UniProtKB/Swiss-Prot annotation:
NCBIfam families in the cross-refs: rsmG_gidB
Name of protein: Ribosomal RNA small subunit methyltransferase G
Transferase as UniProt keyword: yes
GO MF terms, alphabetically ordered: rRNA (guanine-N7-)-methyltransferase activity
Keyword Aminoacyl-tRNA synthetase tagged: no
Functional summary from the UniProt entry: Specifically methylates the N7 position of a guanine in 16S rRNA.
Amino acid sequence: MDEILKYFPNLTDLQIEQFQKLDFLYHNWNEKINVISRKDIDSLYTKHILHSLGIAKVMKFEPGTTVLDVGTGGGFPGIPLAILFPETRFYLIDVIAKKIKVVQGVVDALELKNVKAEQKRAELVKGDFDFIVSRAVTNMPDFVSWIKDKIKKQHKHKLKNGILYLKGGDLSEELKDFPAATLYDLSEIFEDEFFETKKVVHLPLKFKP
């Protein structure tokens, strides 16, 4: 929890309480449904929560923003971002029902009113969103093909509507067909060596009628 306060010192008392609860909630759920690897669960705050919040260092969501989290797994990056941005609406989806069961359990325990969680494929999602977030669920060309028709036309942020994607390693080959993509190195924001090769990729996408 200390690493969260280090990089996000202006949290409200409620946000601090919610972030603190995540430790118990995920350890408890993980004993029943394995959504976080055994070797990573004890590094929950660094490898999952702080990593998710890397998006918040790139983009401050304005009130009323809508965000789709594709392949949310146990709720990352959606749940940490929903705690940080209570006036932003988050829609978390995953194709695996037991993962959504965990997500819903955590959301209910935290009383997050700005989160909807559902078992669904990205291609079947109705509606459009300001931003679509994810954490390395697939390669970028496939990801874009899933969600390219789900971006809102009107922009209200400095960064244009589109994808905010958490991924590590050398992305040059994967992004060669996306010259509009901008990479933000999390190693320049967070000190832990875990973030040495981790990045946030912003890929603006035009509205597709």
